[in-house]
C-alpha cells in the first residue's frame, strides 16, 4: 500500500533528499547497475561478459535519462536515511553541503554490532556495506562490493566501526596501485603533444620507459571498460546538472528544512518523520531487513520507510492512524479524491512541509521548539491534533467514519474505491481480533 505514486512523490521530495541530491555523483548509477548486469549475466550464462558486451551496457547506462538517475538516487538516499541514526542526520546533511565541518555520522548496526549492508537496486541479490555506498555515491570512486577492507577511517573518527561519513573514509592504496599509476601517467605524457615538464627528458631516461611500457602491456590486462579519462570525467559529474525533471533547486530554496543559503547561521526545525526511528530500530537488525524490495520491485513496502516512520508499530501492522491525524487529513489540501485532482508534485510537497519548517523565520512550529533535534520517546504521534506529515496515501474506506473505534483493526490493503458507501457495519467475530484481516 506504500508504493502508490503519491507516496513515492513524498519520498522523493523529502528535505533530506533534496539537500543531498545535488551532491550525488551520476557515476554511482552507472557503476551499481553495471555490476548488477555483469552478475546477472554470469548467473544466466555461466560465463562473464565479453568486453564488447560490457562496453555496450556501459554506454547504455551512461546515456540513461537524467530523471531516471535522479529517481534512483532519491530512492537510495531515502534508504540510507533510515540507516543513519536520527541524531546524526542533520550533521550529515550539513557536512555534505559544506555548512558544517565533517563529524562522525553513525549508522544503525546490525545484530552483531557491525556495519549494515543494503541493496542499492531493485530486486538486487547483492548487498553493499554502507560506507562503501557512501564513498561511491558522494566521491564517485569505483569500488567493488568486496573492497570494504580497503577503506580506512580517519584519525579523528570516534567510531570507525559504524561511521559512514564520506569525509572520514579513505581508500588505501597498495604498491600495485602506485605501480599502475606510474605507467598511466607516462603513457598520457607520451601521447600529449605538449612538452613534458617535471620529468627528465634525456634520451637515456626515455629508452627504459619504452621498454617498461612494453613489459607493462605484457604483464597486465585491463578488465574494465572505462578509460582513465572517461572514468575521471564521469566520476565528477553530479546526478543533478541544472534543473531536474520534476523540480528545480532554485524553487526548492526557502522550502527545505536544510537551508541551502550559506549566510544562514542557524537552523530551527522539526523532523517528525524521524522521531520513531530510534524506537523501532531494534526490531530490524538483520541483513534481511536491509533488502526492502517487494515483488513489484518497489523499495518502500516495509514499515521502516521514511513516509511511514511517523506511525507506531501497531499502526504499521494494521494500517491505521489516530483519529486526530485523520481529522487533520480531512482538512488538509492533500485529501483530494484522486491524484489527478491534486496540485503538481512540487507545490504539493512545499505546501505539505511548510507547517513543519521554520528555517527562515527562526520560529520552530513544533510541540517541542528547540534549536536542536528533539526525538520524543514517549509518543510517536502528537497527542493533540496536528498537521505533521499527513499520509495522503492512506485513506479510510467510505463506510468507515473518522470516529469508528474499530478502524485500526481494518486492513487497508483493499482498494477503497471498491467499497460501497453506507452505514457502518460491524462483524461479530472480528472485534476480538488483534491482527488485520487480509481477506
UniProtKB/Swiss-Prot annotation:
Question: What's the short name of a Pfam family annotated to this entry?
Answer: CTF_NFI
Residue ranges annotated as compositionally biased, kind Low complexity, are 301-310
Per the record, the domain of life is Eukaryota
Q: Which InterPro entries match?
A: CTF/NFI (IPR000647), CTF/NFI_DNA-bd-dom (IPR020604), CTF/NFI_DNA-bd_CS (IPR019739), CTF/NFI_DNA-bd_N (IPR019548), MAD_homology1_Dwarfin-type (IPR003619)
Q: Which SMART domains match?
A: DWA (SM00523)
Q: Tell me where the transmembrane regions lie.
A: none
Q: Which PROSITE patterns match?
A: CTF_NFI_1 (PS00349), CTF_NFI_2 (PS51080)
GO cellular component annotations of the record:
nucleus
| UniProt keyword annotation of Nucleus present | yes
Localisation per UniProt entry: Nucleus
Q: Which GO terms describe its biological process?
A: DNA replication; positive regulation of DNA-templated transcription; regulation of transcription by RNA polymerase II
Q: What is its main location?
A: nucleus
- Biased composition regions of type Polar residues, renumbered to the chain: 333-349
Q: Where is this region: Disordered?
A: 191-214, 260-349, 415-439
Question: Which UniProt key words apply to this protein?
Answer: Activator, DNA replication, DNA-binding, Nucleus, Transcription, Transcription regulation
Q: Where is this motif: 9aaTAD?
A: 404-412
Which residues fall under the DNA-binding region feature? 1-195
Subunit architecture: Binds DNA as a homodimer.
What the entry says about domains is: The 9aaTAD motif is a transactivation domain present in a large number of yeast and animal transcription factors.
The free-text function statement in the UniProt record for this protein reads: Recognizes and binds the palindromic sequence 5'-TTGGCNNNNNGCCAA-3' present in viral and cellular promoters and in the origin of replication of adenovirus type 2. These proteins are individually capable of activating transcription and replication.
Family, per entry: Belongs to the CTF/NF-I family.
Q: What is this protein called?
A: Nuclear factor 1 C-type
Q: Which gene encodes it?
A: NFIC
Amino acid at each position: 500500500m506504500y508504493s502508490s505514486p503519491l507516496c513515492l512523490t513524498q519520498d522523493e521530495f523529502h528535505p533530506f533528499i533534496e539537500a543531498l541530491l545535488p551532491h550525488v555523483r551520476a557515476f554511482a548509477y552507472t557503476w551499481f547497475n553495471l555490476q548488477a548486469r555483469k552478475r546477472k549475466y554470469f548467473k544466466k550464462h555461466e560465463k562473464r561478459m565479453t568486453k564488447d558486451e560490457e562496453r555496450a551496457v556501459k554506454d547504455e547506462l551512461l546515456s540513461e535519462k537524467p530523471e531516471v538517475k535522479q529517481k534512483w538516487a532519491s530512492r537510495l538516499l531515502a534508504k540510507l536515511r533510515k540507516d543513519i541514526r536520527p541524531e546524526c542526520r542533520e550533521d550529515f546533511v550539513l557536512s555534505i553541503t559544506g555548512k558544517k565541518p565533517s563529524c562522525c555520522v553513525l549508522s544503525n548496526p546490525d545484530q552483531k554490532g557491525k556495519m549494515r549492508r543494503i541493496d542499492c537496486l531493485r530486486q538486487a541479490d547483492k548487498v553493499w556495506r554502507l560506507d562503501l555506498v557512501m564513498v561511491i555515491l558522494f566521491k564517485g570512486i569505483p569500488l567493488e562490493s568486496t573492497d570494504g577492507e580497503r577503506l580506512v577511517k580517519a584519525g579523528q573518527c570516534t567510531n570507525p566501526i559504524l561511521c559512514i561519513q564520506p569525509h572520514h573514509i579513505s581508500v588505501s592504496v597498495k604498491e600495485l596501485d602506485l605501480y599502475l599509476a606510474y605507467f598511466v601517467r607516462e603513457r598520457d605524457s607520451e601521447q600529449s603533444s605538449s612538452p613534458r615538464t617535471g620529468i627528465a627528458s634525456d634520451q637515456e631516461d626515455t629508452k627504459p620507459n619504452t621498454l617498461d611500457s612494453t613489459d607493462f602491456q605484457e604483464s597486465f590486462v585491463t578488465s574494465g571498460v572505462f578509460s582513465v579519462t572517461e572514468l575521471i570525467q564521469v566520476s565528477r559529474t553530479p546526478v543533478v546538472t541544472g534543473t531536474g525533471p520534476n523540480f528545480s533547486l532554485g524553487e526548492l530554496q526557502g522550502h527545505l528544512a536544510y537551508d541551502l543559503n550559506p549566510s544562514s547561521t542557524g537552523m530551527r526545525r522539526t523532523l517528525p518523520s524521524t522521531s520513531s526511528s530510534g524506537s523501532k530500530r531494534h526490531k530490524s537488525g538483520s541483513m534481511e531487513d536491509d533488502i526492502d524490495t517487494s515483488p513489484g520491485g518497489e523499495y518502500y513496502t516495509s514499515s521502516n520507510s521514511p513516509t511511514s516512520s511517523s506511525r507506531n508499530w501497531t499502526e504499521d501492522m494494521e494500517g491505521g492512524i489516530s483519529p486526530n491525524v485523520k481529522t487533520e487529513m480531512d482538512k488538509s489540501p492533500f485529501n483530494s479524491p484522486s491524484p489527478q485532482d491534486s496540485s503538481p508534485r512540487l507545490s504539493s510537497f512545499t505546501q505539505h512541509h511548510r507547517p513543519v519548517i521554520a528555517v527562515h523565520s527562526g520560529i520552530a512550529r513544533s510541540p517541542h521548539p528547540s534549536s536542536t533535534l528533539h526525538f520524543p520517546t514517549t509518543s510517536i504521534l502528537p497527542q493533540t491534533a496536528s498537521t505533521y506529515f499527513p499520509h495522503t496515501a492512506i485513506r479510510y474506506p467510505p463506510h468507515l467514519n473518522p470516529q469508528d473505534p474499530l478502524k485500526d483493526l481494518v486492513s487497508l490493503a483493499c482498494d477503497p474505491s471498491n467499497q460501497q458507501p453506507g452505514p457502518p457495519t460491524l462483524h461479530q467475530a472480528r472485534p476480538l481480533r488483534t491482527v488485520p484481516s487480509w481477506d
